[in-house]
Amino acid sequence: MIKLYNTCMDFKCLNDVECSHPEKILGPHLEDAYIIRAYIPIARAAFILIDNKKYQMIDNGKVFEYRSDNEINDYKILYIDDSGYEKTIDDPYRFRPEISDYDIYLYGTGRLFEAYKTFGAHLKTIKDVSGCNFVVWAPSALSVSVVGNFNHWTPGMHPMINVNDSGIWALFIPGIKENEVYKFAIKTKNNEIKMKTDPFAFYTEKRPRTGSIVINDDFHWTDNSFKRSENALSIYEMHLGSWKRNNGDYYNYREIADMLIDHLKKTGFNCVEIMPVMEHPLDISWGYQVVNYFAPTSRYGKPDDFKYLVNRLHENNIMVILDFVPAHFPDDDYGLYMFDGTHLYDYEDPRMGRTPDWGTNIFDFGRNGVRSFIASAAVFWIDKYHVDGLRFDAVTSMIYLDFGRKPGEWIPNINGGNINLEAVSLLKEINDYIHNKYYNVITVAEESSTYPGITSESGLNFNYKWNLGWMHDTLDFFHEDPLYRKYRINNLTFSVMYMYSENFILPVSHDEVVYGKGSLYRKMPGNKNEKISNVKLFLSYMFSYPGKKLLFMGNEFAQKNEWNVLSQLSWNDLDDGKYVMELIHDLNNLYKNDFNFYNDKNFSWIDFNDKTNTVISFNRGNAVCIFNFTPVERENYAIGVDYPSRYIEIINTDSKKYNGGNILNESIYACKYPMHGRRYSIEIDLPPLAAVIMEPEDLNGSSGN
């Protein structure tokens, strides 16, 4: 026990909600006697219960006190509130909150990358007493207290301990159980009390309510046998709330699971990328303005429901990637912004700390506590939710200090440059940690600049980078009237110049089908049939081109309208789109199972100079890929090939299987007529606005895959 002496000043800090060391006043103490104190501002009377006997506690300005000549080790407190309600509690201050000095040290040095195991709300049993251990970082706060229904949301009734004056506050509260709603009441140096959500909350109330919820982490996983794909990666990007709706309302994570699995099997994708599930207040932010980085949104259910979704996907050999937003956070008053009355999580200077385009706050990547927080938020989803990868959003905005800013609106780094050295080092550290600890988990950068080494081990060490240059150039080409596409062939050939500079994913993402940009279908010129043909041609080109694949939901069946986050996909478009979906299934199977296509190094041009016919062709290994970008059939079109073999057509987007005109090339024998630098050639009938993919028959009589 601690020896202390009672002074009115000690109690004043409690009544003023400014107590940073309540353990020095409350709980059991040895002074001139054995004294037990409890601060219960909502009580009109309090009693101590010892060996089933009740003793009156003295009210000293809502600090209730009991004195004894004998040491008391086991007791409870009964209080009566102003309404006459009686409640019996264990005294939080006879327990030491659980946080190690080493964790405090690591968090303060920016190297506690699994801080979620310590911070937040954790159900525990201490000295045979069950309760919840709360830990939060708020270094500039005068006091922090836990509030909830258990104390009538009264600030100061459960003041936390500023452990070692580290700015990390902790308190074990007995009796707290699963599903208890809580917040932190933070007294700032401006004499304000802010009611804040727990930055490490693992579950929250459904919007518009903002309370954090205590959960028990006891989900039973059955995905031990799941193996992540190491070769082909075909990603279906989706937004859970607008994929399908249940009579206008959201489906639960569990309800989504089997519907999604069935759809992915029909289309052949082996990976799903889910737009941010981390809790966010605003539906129309799509999830990219996150407040609770450790909580799956309660829009679609509870944390165990989301774990169920991931587990079911793994049971069906489908990988799961989550979008992760480490760059910035919103202004919502209950969240990270001005958390302890200061710019704790963001840069204070708006030239560093404010995004000019999005009106959000940029994380202070140089503050060690923030580094621990962001890194832990990334690792958390891999550790606790078994996800197979993270797609880091807005990496360019993290790297560049002048991102979206005019001259004079940004602060150079210590070398006078425009690189945020703190952000760059943090990204590198997070990637290194993940790759060292988790086998075959992938990280992906959405990065649009020419910053070098995004996917190199000596650079930022991401596994993949979105090839946004390829995406924009290719979509611009397809948007062009076929009559003029011959003047834009460079749009297709330019990306080959840098295709191996990074490990790329070819994305056709949500960003390209919103804000008036139109759906993939609407981007295409021509009448309805020509638009569908162009979509099939585009998808075939994408799946033939080196790089992993990513396609946003709706594009797999050529949805006509652009994406609307407030409604479900236009599933009625499947009447026409089912043929596109059949093609996607076949393209995915080809890509996943044929080494020629999933080995990104297998690429060589056959011909990119036929601007007259607007036809290009290339090899993927020994496969021959030919693309006719005009609505004109090219009969007896000659292509150079490497083998004196019979060539088998494995994809033809004009096939009746895909509702095309059925101009086919079932088998073509190569002749000894050199062409395009090859010793042999074949002549094919090339359908209008179509892709044809052929492979040579091998010695065993099958196509060479």
Swiss-Prot record:
Pathway the protein acts in: Glycan biosynthesis; glycogen biosynthesis
Xref: Pfam families: Alpha-amylase, Alpha-amylase_C, CBM_48, GlgB_N
Entry GO CC: cytosol
Signal sequence residues: none
Sequence intervals crossing the membrane: none
EC numbers on record: 2.4.1.18
Matching SMART domains: Aamy
Catalyzed reactions: Transfers a segment of a (1->4)-alpha-D-glucan chain to a primary hydroxy group in a similar glucan chain
InterPro entries: A-amylase/branching_C, Branching_enzy, GlgB, GlgB_N, GlgB_N_E_set_prok, Glyco_hydro_13_cat_dom, Glyco_hydro_13_N, Glyco_hydro_b
Superkingdom of origin: Archaea
HAMAP family: GlgB (MF_00685)
NCBIfam families: branching_enzym, PRK05402.1, PRK12313.1
Protein family per UniProt: Belongs to the glycosyl hydrolase 13 family. GlgB subfamily.
Quaternary assembly: Monomer.
Function noted in UniProt: Catalyzes the formation of the alpha-1,6-glucosidic linkages in glycogen by scission of a 1,4-alpha-linked oligosaccharide from growing alpha-1,4-glucan chains and the subsequent attachment of the oligosaccharide to the alpha-1,6 position.
Protein name, entry field: 1,4-alpha-glucan branching enzyme GlgB
Gene that produces this protein: glgB
